[in-house]
Amino acid sequence: LIDHAWGYEPCTIKDVKAYKPSVNSLSSGQVLQEPYPFEKARLIVKEMADFLAMDLFEKRLVTNQIVIDIVYDAENLSRPEINYNGEVKEDRYGRKMPAAAHGSHNLGKFTSSTAVLVEEFDKLFRKTANHDLLVRKLNLCASFTLDEKTAAENRAAEQISFFDDASATASEEEKTAKERKRQEAVLEIRKKYGKNAMLKGMNFEQGATGKSRNKQIGGHKE
C-alpha cells in the first residue's frame, strides 16, 4: 500500500507474464441455432466433451472436476405439449424461460481421457437436464485443471494402500497408455490436415454441429 501511495508498482511485466494461477479451468460453450430436444442436445454434449478432452490433451492438462450449464429455450413456455410448471427466469432481453440448470461432478482422479470425459459429461447431462425441455445453450467446463507433470508428481507422492489391487492398477495404466497413443495420433492428423480430417460417427448424426464448428473462427464461418 505504501508503494502504491508513492506511485511505485513493485509488480513488473516480467512478474505478470511469469504468474500462473494455482487453479485453472478450460471450458467450451455453444449457442444452438434452434431449440434442441433432450436426445439431440445429448449428442451435442458428447461432441463438445470429445473436443474439450482433445483440447486438454493438446495443452497437456488434466482435470478432476467437470461442470455443465444448460440454458433452456423460451419456446418451452409456449408449447402446450411441454406443460412446464417449474421455476421461470428472465434473460437480459426480458424474455421468460425455464430456469437454467447447473451440475458438477468430481471424477476422483485427474484425466484428459476422451473416453472418460465423454462418458462422465453424458452422465452429468442426463442427471442435470430436464428431459422434457428444449435446450438452447450449453457450456461444458473442466473446472479444475493441472498440467500433466504436476498431476503425475502429486499422484506419485500419494502412498499406495497395501490393499490396492496391483493388477487392476496396471491394467488401468495400460488402458490409459493405449488411449494416449490414439489421442496423440488424432492430434497429429488434425494438426496436419485440419480438425475435420478425423471425425467420429456421432459427428455425422442428424443435428451434430462439431463438423461445422470446426470450420469456424471465433464463432464465425471461415
Describe the residue ranges of each PLM region.
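Basic, low-complexity intrinsically disordered segments
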Residues: 1-222
